[in-house]
């Protein structure tokens, strides 16, 4: 193999980094780029006088040389089972080096750890988040090596399709412009500690800043300006134990001072406000917490709890706990025992240390969600508090000593959660002292060029918002401008200053930001930026930004995609509002509409609550309603104008001669709204975490809620709410809101029970939507019978008359509240407090005491308001019943007034004669009918004389009470049955009966 001399600039660059304690970046281009890593690593090891540095190797797909297969091969080589190919340097490198292979999806576990070399391959899988996580783990003097495949020009990266772009594309917007990659390459050209080489380590002329690399003078290099102060502090605490032994382990004056402050708080053993420690990456926060834990053990604290987003983030913390134990002369196994996790995801991280030297003490890791385990805590330490959801951090603070540390800029701290919300709230509520700050870097020395490059690239220093010196213009004098993203991410000096201002407003006014948001802002094809500016005073200076609005176009989804989504459960990327609304209401036509979603509205923190946000939203609504007309004669810019990324032909490329420079033709950064044609939209929407203030803001802006998530957000513990506004009046928005209000009203007693009453009332009332066309049926008697029994109404009547207490009608409040808030009870007028009481007691199921605390009202006043509301409700129900009864009665207009009466044609005498004739005729007819019948058998026998004698005989008392007279007809001896039909007559009895003397005496007589 022919050996080639390596460019001396590579060796000088690495040696300078080791002398200065600064990191060095190499971009290796070519298919054999991986084979150059051992060479660069060998130069590094020869330049340092310490143990061989560890390597963090990150990849998207499994790399057999780095993963388990490579480890097994390295073991076989070490024991001599496999011969090492001397030509293959990678085998020797693999055997002699500790390499930690990580998938990009697992890099969250490397936070807080330190490596000597970081290798990043599979450039298409890189994201700003991954870049920030991995680069910041490299110590001073270490290497960051970025491996790229063969390229004809670095400008090919401008149009490379990145993996993250799949999430940016939507069905209606497929073309992605790689503005972030262009800005990344241009920023590398400005970095003095970055070299671009090919796969035979030939240095490429990326920029003129790396043409000459001169060795630095090692005299005074790497020394801290506060070294004398650190030495003085260590000497002053030398005789004070355990503080002296622990402070002696600190590397910087800031870190030593922080440890001393923590120890001072531990000595008192009294409940104090939480102490905070803030710093940028690599300043030694975790190490300071670890030494403080060792001091707490020495002072006798029994239950010490440590929490962090992930146990692997605490590797440095526990490492310095053990170093503190060594300084205090604790012996492992004799004085303490280490327990590691058996969870495969935690990679055998330390989760517990049991100390048994003088008494039983415990250092225990708990997950951020296990706040219920802190009841017996004596000390709680929270590492990387900014990466933990803010509600969980608030729950952790209790009646025990709390130390917390967090990154306020850098990857973990790119949100205002800790620096602006939590710490300021602690200072206000608990009278806590200002947070301790670590300025000096430990992982690498100050003025590290790689740190400056990364901060500028990802705008990680945006936590400090520049103040505006131009005063407060009136909102009506401010105008909204469209921001051209090609110009914003062109890496022009003015554009960079404007971008940093814009991102700083984002970070300071939004809960959580990540570096990935910057790439979405730059590359997502459906996203657009607007900013509200005051009156421009100077034309030679950048205008001050008051409000930033980021929007995303959504909708225009095909019928086939809608069918796949709703029928098969598949959802495409993006289009948040169309998919959620279509799924919520089963409307297959809504995703076909074109809409715009307001992703963020960020107001400068010094000018919040002054009407600027409302003004910006109003101008945006007018813009998409096409109310901004161009009064000039010049042509209007197309909405697709300004595609600033130039495609370069391969014949024109030369990697060995190419120098990267910003584009010479840059479009206008800011455009007036009338200079750009707006996209056609059917609605404007927004999605945000529901709070009372934000709901009030969007309602005042004319938006209507149509969706409320039942699952709260893990980071903010808020429920996502979608609100819509239509430029033109549409009936479907009122129907959506009517259904939304009905659903939310039912869920307020379940999922949304913990909501504040005023928030629930705000959800149920909206003046921006017309619900008249979708009004429900007003309460009537049949509906009243469905909801209430007569006895229920009697109970309500009894309470209204003060004849019973309110608990007797508590069960009726649910139905009353449902009817009232659905608008079914016509004529029932309640004030705002009465509405809140009815909603809280009837729907949310809150108690009177809890509601009194929430509304800040005494119980007797609350019940008085409640009584008045129920009295009015009873009157409405009575009016419904009265109307029903009146409806069943004849109205006065329906009564007969005699208009249809006619005079009689006959006189009274003639009418009586006529009736008598009819009666006589009827009697004669009846008599004739009776004569025709045979009534002889019913004739009573005997004469008048016979009946008189019989009566006299009976009257004297000699008889038996029966009257008997002679009939004059002789009866036969046997019974005779007369039949009308002789053939059917039954035969006479053949058996002859004996004559009875009594029967013979009574023959011929008839008994009555």
Curated annotation (Swiss-Prot):
Residues 531-713 form the N-acetyltransferase domain. InterPro entries: Acyl_CoA_acyltransferase (IPR016181), GNAT_dom (IPR000182), NAT10 (IPR033688), NAT10/TcmA_helicase (IPR007807), P-loop_NTPase (IPR027417), TmcA/NAT10/Kre33 (IPR032672), TmcA_N (IPR013562), tRNA_bind_dom (IPR027992). It catalyses: a cytidine in 18S rRNA + acetyl-CoA + ATP + H2O = an N(4)-acetylcytidine in 18S rRNA + ADP + phosphate + CoA + H(+); a cytidine in tRNA + acetyl-CoA + ATP + H2O = an N(4)-acetylcytidine in tRNA + ADP + phosphate + CoA + H(+). ATP binds at residues 282-291, 443. GO terms for molecular function: 18S rRNA cytidine N-acetyltransferase activity; ATP binding; tRNA binding; tRNA N4-acetyltransferase activity. Residues 989-1008 have a biased composition (Basic residues). RNA cytidine acetyltransferase with specificity toward both 18S rRNA and tRNAs. Catalyzes the formation of N(4)-acetylcytidine (ac4C) in 18S rRNA. Required for early nucleolar cleavages of precursor rRNA at sites A0, A1 and A2 during 18S rRNA synthesis. Catalyzes the formation of ac4C in serine and leucine tRNAs. Requires a tRNA-binding adapter protein for full tRNA acetyltransferase activity but not for 18S rRNA acetylation. Polycomb group (PcG) protein. HAMAP family: RNA_acetyltr_Nat10. Component of the PRC1 complex (PSC, PC, PH and dRING1) in 0-12 hours Drosophila embryos. This complex is distinct from the Esc/E(z) complex, which contains many other PcG proteins like Esc, E(z), Su(z)12, HDAC1/Rpd3, Caf1-55 and probably Pho. The two complexes however cooperate and interact together during the first 3 hours of development to establish PcG silencing. Part of the small subunit (SSU) processome, composed of more than 70 proteins and the RNA chaperone small nucleolar RNA (snoRNA) U3. This is RNA cytidine acetyltransferase.
